[in-house]
């Protein structure tokens, strides 16, 4: 019997790479317009090199970038980049198709929903709130809550403990086989690979199920939960219509 579903955030709920690329590209154009003497291609490579070294959530990436290029921080250029980045970030953060509908369906099945992310706490909450899906989640566990990243079992285990759910009663949904799937399987959870968010061309995910659209998760959970869960969802919808 499934009682809970745990989601990764980036590239599972939100199209993170598309969003990040758009924000960085906007910052690069603004910094060049402010006087930075570099081609967009050169700037992009150096910025993502810094992200590769220090993490994709690194908050001082443009400071480090300017230090590497100029030997100092030109605050006019830095300000132009940060403002453009933030504007683009606000306008391009979107969920994958059907995310809100899938979460609503799961919510109506009376399942507990959780997020487990390697990102910092504030960044995770900002994304959930901006997408308008924060109200669906009983539990949100971030890097700040455990100090370790997936595939270490601690983040997912903490989410299960907070929801008071056993591993065999929960499903883990994620896009990164080596992190999301392996860690959850170690705990004994059912795993679902979000192939629509896969950035690595993964051939064998090792997951129990794979989906190409988040709505495909619904029949999987219904099957694992038995007919009672589907009956609850249908009954809830009928009750709402009668009102």
Stretches found by the model and what they are:
Residues 1-5, 18, 100, 104-230, ...:
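Asp-based, Mg2+/Mn2+-dependent phosphohydrolase catalytic module
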Residues 2-100:
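N-terminal helical cap/lid subdomain that shapes the substrate entry/recognition surface
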């Amino acid at each position: 019997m499934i009682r809970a579903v745990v989601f990764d955030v980036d590239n599972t709920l939100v199209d993170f790479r598309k969003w990040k690329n758009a924000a960085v590209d906007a910052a690069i154009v603004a910094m060049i317009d402010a006087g930075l003497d570099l081609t967009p291609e050169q700037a992009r490579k150096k910025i993502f090199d810094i992200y590769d070294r220090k993490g994709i959530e690194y908050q001082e990436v443009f400071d480090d970038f300017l230090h590497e290029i100029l030997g100092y921080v030109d605050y006019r250029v830095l300000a132009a980049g940060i403002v453009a980045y933030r504007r683009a970030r606000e306008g391009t953060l979107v969920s994958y198709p059907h995310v809100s509908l899938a979460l609503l369906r799961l919510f109506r099945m009376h399942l507990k929903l959780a997020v487990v992310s390697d990102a910092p706490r504030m960044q995770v909450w900002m994304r959930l709130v901006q997408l308008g899906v924060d109200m669906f989640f009983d539990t949100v566990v971030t890097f700040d809550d455990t100090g370790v990243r997936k595939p270490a079992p601690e983040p997912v285990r903490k989410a299960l403990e907070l929801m008071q759910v056993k591993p065999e009663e929960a499903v883990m949904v994620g896009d990164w086989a080596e992190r999301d799937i392996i860690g959850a399987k170690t705990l004994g959870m059912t795993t679902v690979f979000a192939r629509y968010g896969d950035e690595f061309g993964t051939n064998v995910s090792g997951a129990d199920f794979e989906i190409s659209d988040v709505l495909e998760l619904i029949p999987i959970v219904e099957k694992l939960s038995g007919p009672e869960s589907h009956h609850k969802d249908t009954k809830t919808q009928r009750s709402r219509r009668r009102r």
